[in-house]
């Protein structure tokens, strides 16, 4: 469709002309296979009868279902010795307490991540996995992968007949990596005793903690009703027959005992000991295929981080299977445009940003676990990260119009990812950490071992499932098919920036599934090109485009006139309403002169802390 076509490109709820647009029907069909369980719940395989507006909004609210106004309000914090940003205020405080007790940014990040797994355990915990980026001053940044791995007894066709089994239940569980990752980071970089990092979290789980507003929102979701009736979950989520509300105390005694064992004995009991036996027995009793050997064979991966330069700033991010390479591709594309000059003033600047999002989304279809990619394909991925390739891409970008999705040449279809939480930390020595962790969908597999209190992930859902092409005639990505001990692709993009002098500038990352990498890209543009302070960078409205579906989503902070102007470039625009679920949630820390600032995204009710 060209910009001169008369078909409306900006729709509202009452605009019935959208039903005449074939792309809207493609959108519905495209997501049908993956959203049988909307917002981390069981969902009928044939639920296309839902109204398109309802389906579309639900599709883009999978990671959190947290409804907040887009006129987001929050406040940055400031300190002289470091800062921590997380989605839970008490977890940011725990991180800062580690700094105050002589710990460093790695200690703070570990303690805060443990805390989120206690408090907001619908999105994170030691039953999940993730990625960490660590940057010491004057040293090469390190990427730590502790993504979950598929069990040994899997096959790539195991979910062909029923993809729902990859989203909920025992077969959806991959081998957790979070605990191994946190322990490896501590061994390599931590200063405090291991037990010190767990002590406040054991206390929270045992003595109780206030239910967050985010947790209250989750528990009110209709799809959570079955968990509230489950005899394992009910004592935690609905004690005394009443669903807990924000501010009420929640207790997790079994999880407290598990964390206490880990504090005293390290990770051995979890991967090769008493905790392993309990977890494996529970999973197998429920029909799972995870074995004790699977846990014992788990290992993390340390590697040099990926790097690019943007306007003279060094940008570091995590390696495959994250979406860090896609972030680098997007930044390399935009680095060739003077976005802060009058010639590329708004909305042309926004148009170019969206074009970069579409190209990086096409690039993501080439990604997978690097340990399972052939060498010649790794060369293909490396090409995507080069400045030369970005220059070629710019030759295929128009300053006056967008193109149909085929122009961007995606190779394969990818599953839509979900969930996550993020923590960013920095200390007085300018050691910075950016860590993203997840159990995937809400409460992961929705299975919790009553003995250990561990909530297991459903990360098998992040693999691609062989089968028919999607509504856009793209086949599932073979690079992301299930194989024993393989890690699925991830949308995570932990990121650290240094300034033109090589000094720490910012650590950031996001939660929000497939919207993570576009949120990080947008934040970097606002920080470097538009000179936003950290508060404005995090709280301002964000755009999102992931190429397929071919829809530009704008948070409601963008005016309707902006959406209309983007329409003139040929973009199909969906402008969210004020109380629609936000696209993503950023956690960021920065340094300015001798002071440190932290900002937690108010979209998820977070609060940073500084010291």
UniProtKB/Swiss-Prot annotation:
Cytoplasmic side, ranges: 1-42
Expression induction: Induced upon nitrogen starvation and oxidative stress.
Residue positions binding L-glutamate: 147, 438, 440, 459, 462, 490-491, 512-513
Enzyme Commission identifier(s): 3.4.19.13, 2.3.2.2
Membrane topology: Single-pass type II membrane protein
Modified how: Cleaved by autocatalysis into a large and a small subunit.
Pathway: Sulfur metabolism; glutathione metabolism
Keywords assigned by UniProt, alphabetized: Acyltransferase, Glycoprotein, Hydrolase, Membrane, Protease, Signal-anchor, Transferase, Transmembrane, Transmembrane helix, Vacuole
Transmembrane segments: 43-63
Main location per the UniProt record: membrane
GO cellular component, one term: plasma membrane
Highest rank taxon of the organism: Eukaryota
Sequence ranges on the Lumenal membrane side: 64-611
SUPFAM superfamilies xref list: N-terminal nucleophile aminohydrolases (Ntn hydrolases) (SSF56235)
Glycosylation sites: 138, 153, 297, 396
Homology family: Belongs to the gamma-glutamyltransferase family.
Protein name as catalogued: Glutathione hydrolase proenzyme 2
Organism, scientific name: Schizosaccharomyces pombe (strain 972 / ATCC 24843)
């Amino acid at each position: 469709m060209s910009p001169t076509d008369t078909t409306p490109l900006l729709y509202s709820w009452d605009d019935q002309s959208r039903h005449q647009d074939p792309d809207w029907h493609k959108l519905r069909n495209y997501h049908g296979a993956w959203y049988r369980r909307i917002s981390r719940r069981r969902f009928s395989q044939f639920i296309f009868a839902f109204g398109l507006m309802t389906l579309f909004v639900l599709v883009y609210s999978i990671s959190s279902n947290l409804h907040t106004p887009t006129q987001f309000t929050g406040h940055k914090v400031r300190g002289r010795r470091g800062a921590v940003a997380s989605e839970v205020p008490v977890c940011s405080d725990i991180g800062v307490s580690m700094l105050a007790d002589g710990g460093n940014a790695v200690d703070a990040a570990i303690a805060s991540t443990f805390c989120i797994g206690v408090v907001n355990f619908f999105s994170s915990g030691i039953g999940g996995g993730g990625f960490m980026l660590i940057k010491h001053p004057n040293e090469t940044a390190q990427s730590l992968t502790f993504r979950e791995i598929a069990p040994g007894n899997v096959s790539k066709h195991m979910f062909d007949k029923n993809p729902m089994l990859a989203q909920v239940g025992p077969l959806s569980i991959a081998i957790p990596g979070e605990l191994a990752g946190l322990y490896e980071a501590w061994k390599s970089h931590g200063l405090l005793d291991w037990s010190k990092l767990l002590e406040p979290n054991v206390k929270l789980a045992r003595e109780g903690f206030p239910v967050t507003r985010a947790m209250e929102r989750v528990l009110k979701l209709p799809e959570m009703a079955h968990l509230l009736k489950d005899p394992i979950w009910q004592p935690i989520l609905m004690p005394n027959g009443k669903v807990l509300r924000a501010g009420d105390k929640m207790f997790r005694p079994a999880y407290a005992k598990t964390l206490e064992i880990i504090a005293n004995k390290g990770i051995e009991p979890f991967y090769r000991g008493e905790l392993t036996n309990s977890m494996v027995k529970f999973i197998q009793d429920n029909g799972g295929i995870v074995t004790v050997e699977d846990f014992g064979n788990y290992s993390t991966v340390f590697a040099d981080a990926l790097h690019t330069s943007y306007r003279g700033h060094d940008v570091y991010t995590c390696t495959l299977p994250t979406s860090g390479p896609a972030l680098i591709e997007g930044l390399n594309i935009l680095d060739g445009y003077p976005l802060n000059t009058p010639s590329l003033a708004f909305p042309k600047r926004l148009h170019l940003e969206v074009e970069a999002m579409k190209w990086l989304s096409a690039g993501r279809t080439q990604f997978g676990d690097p340990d399972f990619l052939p060498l010649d394909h790794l060369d293909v991925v490396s090409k995507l990260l080069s400045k030369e390739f970005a220059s070629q891409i710019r030759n295929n970008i128009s300053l006056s119009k967008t193109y149909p999705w085929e122009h961007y040449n995606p190779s394969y279809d990818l599953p839509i990812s979900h969930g996550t939480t993020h923590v960013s930390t920095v200390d007085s020595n300018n050691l910075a950490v950016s860590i993203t962790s997840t159990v995937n969908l809400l409460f992961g597999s929705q299975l919790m071992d009553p003995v250990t209190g561990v909530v297991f992930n459903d990360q098998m859902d992040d693999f691609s499932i062989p089968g028919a092409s999607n509504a856009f005639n793209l086949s599932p990505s073979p690079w992301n098919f299930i194989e024993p001990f393989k890690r699925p692709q991830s949308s995570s993009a932990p990121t650290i920036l240094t300034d033109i002098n090589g000094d720490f500038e910012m650590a950031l990352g996001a939660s929000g599934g497939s919207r993570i990498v576009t949120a990080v890209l947008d934040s970097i543009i606002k920080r470097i090109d538009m000179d936003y302070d950290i508060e404005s960078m995090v709280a301002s409205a964000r755009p999102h485009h992931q190429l397929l579906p071919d829809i530009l989503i704008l948070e409601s902070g963008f005016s309707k006139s902006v959406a209309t102007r983007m329409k003139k470039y040929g973009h199909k625009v969906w402008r969210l309403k004020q109380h629609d679920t936000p696209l993503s949630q950023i956690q960021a820390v920065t340094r300015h002169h001798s002071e440190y600032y932290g900002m937690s995204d108010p979209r998820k009710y977070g609060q940073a802390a500084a010291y």
